[in-house]
Amino acid sequence: MSSPISGFLRFVAVLLAVVSPLVYLAEQRLESFYVFDHKHLHELSTQAIAQHGNNTRAIVGHIVDELRARPETTKYISVQEEWVFNNAGGAMGGMYIIHASVTEYLIIFGTAIGTEGHTGRHTADDYFNILTGEQWAYVPGEYEPEVYPAGSVHHLRRGTVKQYKMPEGCFALEYARGWIPPMLFFGFADGLSSTLDFPTLWQTTVVTGREMLGNLMLGKF
C-alpha cells in the first residue's frame, strides 16, 4: 500500500510531465506575446525628459499620453492613474501600473525620499528607464557602484540579482518582459511577512488582477 508521501510525489511527477512541455512551447513563442519594445520605451523616456526636465509629473504624463496614442499599445494601457505603495525586497516606493499582463508589465516606480533593497531574482528581463534622480546598483566582488542617471537604462537580466538604491528622490519607468506571474510572489512577500499592510496588498491585487484579466480578454498574454 502506497504512503501519502509516495502518492504526492507521483502527483508532482505527473504534473511536471504535463506542465513542462507546455512551458517549453510557450517559452519558444514568448517574443510573439510582447506589444512593447524596450528600445522604443527608452526613446520615449529620453524625449519626455528633454521636453520636461525635472518635472516628473509632466514626464510621466507625456509617456502615458504617447502610449495611449500609439495604435500598437493604446488598448493595453490602463484607463486611470492609480498609485499604491509597493514594498518588495526591503525597498519601499510608490507604484503606478500602466500595463500588466502575463508576459509584460509597465509601471512607474519611485519615491521622493529614497529607498534601498534587493532587486529580486526574476523570470523576466527588467528595464529601469530612469526619469528623474539616480539609481545605484551593486554586485558582489565589485568595489564601485553602477550609477544610472536620468535618461539611462538599468537592465536587470532575467535570473540575475543585485542590491539597488535610489539614494534620494528617483522615479523610473520600469518595463519587465518574460513570465510575470512568478514575480508577484516577490511583490507580495514583504506585505505578508513584514509590513502586514493588508489594505495596500488588497488594492495592489485588485489593480493587478483587473489589468491582467482585462488584457487576457483582449487576447494579450
From Swiss-Prot:
Involved pathway(s): Steroid metabolism; ergosterol biosynthesis; ergosterol from zymosterol: step 2/5
Protein's membrane topology: Single-pass membrane protein
Alphabetized UniProt keyword annotations: Endoplasmic reticulum, Isomerase, Lipid biosynthesis, Lipid metabolism, Membrane, Steroid biosynthesis, Steroid metabolism, Sterol biosynthesis, Sterol metabolism, Transmembrane, Transmembrane helix
GO BP annotation list: ergosterol biosynthetic process
Cellular localisation: Endoplasmic reticulum membrane
EC class: isomerase
Record's GO cellular component terms: endoplasmic reticulum membrane
TM segment ranges: 5-25
Pfam families reported in the protein's UniProt record: ERG2_Sigma1R
Predominant subcellular localization, coarse grouping: endoplasmic reticulum
EC code(s) of this entry: 5.-.-.-
Domain of life the protein comes from: Eukaryota
Protein name, per record: C-8 sterol isomerase
